[in-house]
Structures are given as structure tokens and as C-alpha cells.
Amino acid sequence: MAQLPGILRSLAWDHTGPPAVVDRLDDAMPAITTVPMATPVLALLEGSPHTGPWTLRWTSAGHPPPLLLTQDGQERYLEAGQGLLLGTPPGTGGGSRPNATEPLPPGSTLLLCTDGLIEVPGSDLDTGLARLRRHALALAHEPLDTLCDQLPARMPPGSTDDVALLALRLPSP
């Protein structure tokens, strides 16, 4: 599994859109790894670094959706980029990978996490996503380092999977 991030970076060198890069990774996996399935999300933030406007372009292959927290207290999962896991057998359905775009408002926070943060044995995925949303919203106005420390601590123990959390906060106007 550790090979896939490096392979993904090397396939993205030409700034091709996220869906095409993830498709290339899916095509390459059987030939260059022993990983049968994986769930990446590949996202690209576009816009002027300090002034915006910003747009997120992404695709997901079975990964939990990004969570957007706006400065005015709104929150929602960005589900338009959801697609099939890497390694899903051909003909399973789904067609081409989604190429999702979403404008990101100034001052908003974007959270991406692995399923280890939301999946707990005996609890379904929707419950885990709702729990993450609730705790993230309560921490939305905290500094990012506090949010990243406190959010996993507020999730129930018992996950048997890896936990990773990436948080991005855009400058306020």
C-alpha cells in the first residue's frame, strides 16, 4: 500500500486532471504492485494562494468524501467526486471517474481523512460520517493544529485501520 502514493505522484507530473491520473493508477496497479484494491482521493486546489477565488477539483475512488466547513457555520460532504474503488473488476459499472469541482469560500476549512477515522466496528459508515461532521463543526473555528489534535481524540476508540487527517483552511477576506 505504501507504494501507491509515490506512484500516484509520478503519474500526476503532467498536471492531467484528477480522474485521468486515478484511471492511470488503476490501470498500472496490477502490473506494478501487489495491492488488489485501494481507496485514494486526488484533489487539486486551484486559485491565487492568498486571495482566491479557489476551486477544488477532485475525484475519489471509494475514499470518504471531503468535508467542507464554511466560516458561517455551514458544513457538507462533497460527494460529487465519489467513484469506484481502485481494483474494481472491469464491467462492474460506474463508467468514467467523476471530475468534480467545487468553489471554496474564503475562510472555509476542508477536511480529508482516511476511513480509519470514521469506521468503528459495530457502527455503520453513515453514523461515522455524521459523528465526524458533528465534531468537526464544533471545532471549526479552532486553529488547525487544535482541530487536527482534537478531532481524532473525539472519535470513538476501536478503529483497527490507519488514521490520517488532512486539514486546509483558506484565508479570510
Regions found by a protein language model. Give the residues of each.
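Conserved subregion of the PPM/PP2C metallophosphatase catalytic domain
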Residues: 2-173
